[in-house]
Regions:
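Histidine/acidic residue-rich metal-binding segments in metalloenzymes
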Residues: 2-107, 111-132, 139
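Flexible C-terminal active-site loop/helix
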Residues: 109-173, 177-180, 184
Length: 184
């Protein structure tokens, strides 16, 4: 994945590159074992709970795909009520005792992010000491890669949940609106 790549559309078709940095359905179908792909589709449709085994398989495939495109970090990406995006970056890279590195990314890391949300922007909705919360992976939104001058990051769409059961993000409120509109 190149940063700020300029595409010459006289030589490249938009159809060939559209979605190439998105961990979309076609990529999942290609990289996930058939049973895992099928179970994830059931989870996305609301027919099944996500198991840690499935999350681990998805995380492994997602990491392999992202690293093959130059990613070294991942972030749980969400939209707080300040109309910006918020994210907490973590690395796939873990040092070993012998001074080398290994690449790690587990289903637990995919499913749920930081439990201390004091580093997340609040838009003035709460004091820092009240910042208990976490991000939860939205299985229905595809992860995607973002590149800038510091490198490539895997962005995992999530919803933020505060421990006080308030939802300080627009995304969760939109999901609630859609869910409740179907109940009328």
């Amino acid at each position: 994945m190149e940063n700020n790549r300029i595409v010459d559309f006289s030589k490249t078709s938009l159809h060939d590159i559209y979605g190439e940095n998105c961990f979309n359905d076609a990529i999942m179908r290609e990289l996930l074992p058939k049973a895992v792909y099928k179970e994830l589709k059931e989870v996305q449709q609301g027919n099944k709970e996500l198991t840690l085994e499935t999350a681990n398989a998805v995380a492994s495939a997602m990491k392999t795909w992202a690293v093959s495109k130059g990613a070294t970090h991942f972030t749980h990406w969400f939209q707080p009520l300040n109309d910006l995006t918020a994210e907490k970056h973590d690395s796939f890279i873990a040092p070993t005792e012998d001074g080398k590195v290994i690449l790690e990314f587990s289903g637990k890391e995919l499913i749920k992010g930081e439990s201390d949300a004091s580093s997340f922007p609040s838009g003035g909705l709460r004091a820092t000491f009240e910042a208990r919360g976490y991000t939860a992976w939205d299985t229905t939104s595809p992860a995607f890669l973002m590149a800038d001058n510091t490198g490539v990051t895997l962005n995992i769409p999530t919803a933020f949940w505060s421990s006080s059961v308030q939802s300080p993000n627009t995304y969760h409120r939109c999901l609630n609106t859609f869910r409740h509109s179907g109940e009328r």
